Amino acid sequence: PMNIAVLGMGHLGQAITKYFNGKGLKLKITAAFDVDPEKVGKTIDGIPCYHMDSFEEVVEDKDISIVIVSSPTKVAPNLVLPIINAGIRGVLNFTSTPLNFPQGIIVENYDITTLLEKVAYFVKENEENPTDD
């Protein structure tokens, strides 16, 4: 399996780990990272949670190639350099701040707010201009 880490173990990070845990996919969340002393050093949904200070070391030890960023939006830009330095090859970013990486690192910025606004826009359009099928 391809090993994944979750950066930020708030509500979203924990929901992501719960969702993927035990799915039997070829993707496996093997580590989580946070800075909250209440979370660091604990196992959350079967996944060990490390402090961000040990990010590069854990990524190397666990052969992690993809990260899911679910940190607070204001923290997300500070994660770019550690992600690059650790040799991560893929990023799924769930924050509302688009993250930019050098060529060679695959990035998917997934802003749920923007997507919801898009859906709301089209719902409103359909209500204002109903089509007769």
Where are the predicted features?
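Phosphate-bearing ligand-interacting subdomains
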Residues: P48-D132
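A short secondary-structure junction signal
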Residues: T17-Y19, I44, L79
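Short secondary-structure boundary/capping segments
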Residues: N21, K39-G41, L99
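N-terminal glycine-/serine-/threonine-rich beta1-alpha1-beta2 phosphate-ribose binding loop
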Residues: G13, L25, A32-S65
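Glycine-rich adenosine-cofactor-binding loop
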Residues: P1-K26, T30-D36
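Glycine-centered flexibility sites
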Residues: G8-G13, G41, G87-G90
